[in-house]
A protein has these predicted regions:
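Periodic aromatic/glycine/histidine/acidic cluster detector
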Residues: 19-107, 111-120, 125-130, 137-144, ...
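Bacterial Sec-dependent N-terminal signal peptides
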Residues: 1-29
Length: 217
């Protein structure tokens, strides 16, 4: 379902997760501090269990490289993806039927390094925060800021008007800022009636439809 992504988010987005993180955020000397931590022992245990299960199903699968990631459903019904590399742990989680997921990246000691939210099919959204190893906030980015002129709520109304099935796996929504610093929304979906894809590009400054066409793929 997810082109995972993203993103989606970083080259490291072959990631991992355990249970929902426990966190506390305080402000100290005008600096935000986050004490969210990942239980690294539990994360390592999860990855090992997944590795052992895969080895039973596919003997020799990890002879060349050991398992570094794991996917499971937690007690709250979230699908969790957990991954470890030389610099830290990546954890994402999302729930069936939801359009958005949570992103966390942790230092090797378990302290949180980056937090954010993402749309399951293509883009990061909301407030993303980066912390140093002591939990001090060093960067905060509003991913939605360039698209305030034509927001997600406007996109939802547009999709409803066009009768686009947002939950169809062939439907994708992306957004980007071009080299001229102009923000755009990009929507594509499959019309089963005519067996073709529709592509729409919308200027996020004013909602003007720049492109509305059919592409045969």
């Amino acid at each position: 379902m997810v082109k995972l992504f993203l993103i989606i988010a970083s080259a490291f987005f072959t990631a991992c997760v355990s249970r929902a993180p426990q966190k506390a955020i305080t402000k100290k000397k005008n600096r935000m501090t986050c004490f969210e931590r990942l239980d690294t022992a539990e994360a390592n245990k999860r990855i090992l269990e997944c590795s052992e299960k895969e080895e039973m199903e596919f003997p020799g699968i990890h002879l060349i490289e050991p398992a570094t990631d794991c996917e499971f459903v937690d007690s709250m019904g979230y699908t969790v993806y957990l991954c470890k590399n030389d610099s830290g742990y990546l954890k994402t989680r999302w729930k069936a039927g939801n359009l958005f997921g949570e992103y966390r990246y942790y230092f090797l000691n378990g302290n949180v390094q980056e937090t954010g939210e993402y749309f399951l099919r293509e883009f990061n959204c909301g407030i993303w925060r980066e912390y140093d190893i002591d939990g001090n906030l060093i960067k905060e980015t509003d991913m939605d800021k360039p698209y305030k002129g034509y927001s997600w709520q406007n996109i939802m109304l547009f999709i409803k008007k066009r009768n686009i099935d947002l939950y169809d796996e062939e439907t994708n929504i992306d957004r980007y800022v071009d080299e001229s610093n102009v923000p755009y929304w990009y929507i594509t979906w499959f019309d089963r009636g005519i067996k073709a894809f529709h592509d729409i590009i919308i200027d996020a400054r004013n909602g003007y439809v720049v492109k509305d066409g059919i592409s045969h793929r």
